[in-house]
């Protein structure tokens, strides 16, 4: 039985009072000798963000904007799944499932809602993120999330087929969808293709110059930037205490990723705080990282993608994989270079993203 109920976001003012008290009572590190972002989030940058979060930022603005769009909670097995379902204005509107990743949320795609009126848009909160719960076992992986999303689209919402969009962990989710349910997934739009492990582990003399450049960049990135993957994959509980108890600690962990993975100069502080507020108020900073554990230890092999695939590549994203590798591994029908934006894709560049998606669907 899958019960479904309407949902609206409503964070009580008392929770913002508590947030401001916690920020005011924060104990900051004494040592300010590390400058810049190479060592993580700088103290002065984080102080400025916390000051604005406590004394200038207005969540109710975002809350009212989001509540204009239909939201629901659906009970599927032992998971409460939150999702937006915005029916298209056209008859027989093409359904689009959009899958976000970490450390973001449904907010990755929220700016595209008014740009995609002709389509039926479905954006779930991944289990463990925002208003969606984890299963009783305490973690989930991309494969299980794909099955959950397919049931949402077909059994709950009644769609026979749909287009799937994903980035970051959402990319893995929709790729499992495409390999497991190719009769239902009409097409796949990806904003990244993950990590090309076969390039990174191949001998240098077997690689093209472009592949060798990628291997060197990927090796350096994993050494300097990839520690979070190992921590979240192995010790999510230990990390979770600080993420749950301190808004400053949570922000320090997340802001670094937003800075390093995005087109930061174009990134709005309100966009950043919208996501931080959602994480803080739902206490999902600790539960969201459980997917790394699930993916590291319980993920089954993925089949080959056979459905038509589009790539929307953003210039400030991390580790862009060489196009020839993508062509070998996906049935590529469209490759769009976005004019700006980074890893958080439609949050940073909603208009170019929406145009690429519309073009892809038109030609399916």
Language-model segment annotations:
Residues 15-87, 271, 280, 286-300:
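Non-catalytic accessory segments flanking enzyme active sites
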Residues 143-162:
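Conserved acidic catalytic loop of the alpha/beta-hydrolase fold
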Residues 2-8, 12-17, 23, 27, ...:
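Alpha/beta-hydrolase
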Residues 107-121:
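Short amphipathic alpha-helix adjacent to the substrate-entry channel of hydrolases
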Residues 93-101:
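Short beta-strand element of the alpha/beta-hydrolase
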Residues 232-364:
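C-terminal subdomain of alpha/beta-hydrolase-fold enzymes, centered on the catalytic histidine
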Residues 59-61, 107, 111, 126-140, ...:
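Glycine-rich "HGGG/HGxG" loop immediately N-terminal to the catalytic nucleophile
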Residues 115-118, 157-208:
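Conserved hydrolase catalytic core segment
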